[in-house]
């Protein structure tokens, strides 16, 4: 199935706290304070980031989008309704999955819980493979299309050359780095790496690979791990 699950359920609290340190104009800052970060307008067109992402996904060959949001998601529906051209050919659909807080909690849990709730609400995700990504990263058509190609492995992800992202050292240092073996199979993901770990995981070309949370999973193999994921 050409399915893409997009995670857009967070409160964007860290981003909103840092808005005053950005070079965004006053209008964009005001919008960013009101909406999820995936709905912030970008570029000359001022289309929301999510719309750019959906356009790239459609161009890459995806047909079914599962957008994970908080239950109060009317803003997402309002924004997407302003772009009917996305849905004009009838082969591109957006389904909404809601991430509910667990009983006794005011806030939802993390990524594993979000994906598990989406799979529970849409059982077809358990029966098929799907791509998973963040709603606040703008992935290229090329990267999204790569994960639709046939693979021998049941799961896969896109690794990015750290130096090619052109982010500040402070920002890039927060990215998880990927340990890959000689055949490019993932052996470990290192969150918040130290400078020593960065040096340790450089390859023979002095490259360090990082994750931008762009994955391909086989649903039936993934679900048991989501169900057993510890809370931390």
Regions found by a protein language model. Give the residues of each.
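Active-site mouth loops of central-metabolism enzymes
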Residues: 37-43
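Conserved beta-strand segments of alpha/beta enzyme cores
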Residues: 38, 93-95, 185
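Conserved beta-loop-beta/alpha segment of the NTase-like Rossmann-fold superfamily
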Residues: 92-177
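Conserved N-terminal catalytic core of the sugar/cofactor nucleotidyltransferase
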Residues: 1-6, 12-30, 43-128
